[in-house]
A protein has these predicted regions:
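Acidic, Ser/Thr/Pro-rich intrinsically disordered cytosolic tails and loops
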Residues: 1-308
Length: 308
């Protein structure tokens, strides 16, 4: 029996640590989980990602793609990641997109990270406010269906041009897929045309034509239909790989340790409950600890007052 109880003694602290780490990643306030009625329509893909509690480095990559597609920014260098805002800033950007661009005006990595944390706190609070009175479960199902439909349209495209167009239109929605990395690599095996905004995301991209193209000219409108005129068909695997590494770039080059970054957000939006004290106020924890002395074979270790 000693081995069994030793396993329990070792296992409980390990499980506690795992649960504590998982708790730090849950940045949505508890009230969002209180079931209301009906679907909250009108959320953006980024807001839907927050509702799904997607990793925050992925959420910020979605914001990056959003401002690039809207001609509000371009990537100057990938390593280190430097972003140049358009001048003037286009109308119609969301507050979180404006805050994102403001953060990247800062040269200091520490200052930029702090501003990105503030941006994420405001975004989580915004989604929490929008979800008041609505069903999170029904809303999640609704946006997961949108995500799946976006992928189906891309997968059903019968030409590289159509596939590129569908991908361009639905990029942020496809990123809601938990298997985004694998699915992107699987779907884009054949050659495809780079999205019209590709030159603003990939500063090393050289268009096939020597003439200025939509893909190479910064801050040109990206709402034009996809055309192969003046654009090169690139290996789909290359495009897929660069989309996936965009998330990895945010993790390693901008956010740093994503767990530490997220923990700071959670501390502001979903802080852990304050411990309640019962009984005496001695140096140890009252009523919540479990001190077992397991001596030898056949002993029974009884923990009183420590269970939940």
């Amino acid at each position: 029996f000693c081995g069994f109880f030793a396993l329990i003694i070792v296992g409980i602290p390990t499980l506690t640590v795992i649960q504590a780490n998982r708790r730090k990643m849950q940045y949505l306030p508890p009230r969002v989980s209180i079931e209301g009625r009906g679907i909250k329509r009108g959320l953006t893909a980024v807001e839907s990602a927050i509702l799904m509690e997607q990793p925050l480095d992925k959420v910020m990559t979605m914001i990056l793609f959003g401002v690039i597609k809207k001609n509000a920014a371009e990537v100057v260098t990938r390593d280190p990641l430097k972003i140049k805002s358009a001048s003037p800033i286009p109308d119609g950007l969301h507050e979180y997109e404006l805050n994102f661009l403001r953060a990247f005006k800062e040269e200091s990595a520490k200052t930029r990270r702090g501003l990105l944390q503030q941006m994420m706190v405001k975004l989580v609070q915004l989604v929490s406010e929008k979800m008041k009175g609505f069903s999170r479960r029904e809303t999640l199902d609704y946006y997961k269906a949108i995500m799946e439909k976006a992928w189906q349209q891309i997968e059903a495209a019968d030409t590289p041009e159509v596939k590129s167009q569908k991908f361009d239109e639905a990029l942020e929605w496809t990123m809601l897929d938990k298997n985004y990395d694998d699915r992107t690599r699987r779907v884009f095996r054949e050659p495809m045309y780079a999205p019209t905004w590709w030159g603003r995301y990939n500063p090393t991209h050289i268009p096939a034509s020597s003439k200025p193209t939509v893909a190479s000219a910064p801050f040109q409108t990206s709402g034009q239909p996809v055309s192969s005129s003046g654009r090169s068909a690139l290996p789909g695997a290359d495009i897929a790989a660069q989309m996936v590494t965009g998330v990895q770039t945010f993790s390693s080059k901008v956010v740093g340790n994503v767990n530490t970054f997220t923990e700071k957000i959670t501390g502001a939006t979903n802080p852990p409950p304050k411990p309640t004290s019962s009984g005496g106020s001695g140096g140890g924890r009252s009523g919540g600890g479990c001190a077992c002395a397991c001596a030898c074979a056949g002993c029974a270790c009884a923990c009183a007052g420590g269970g939940r």
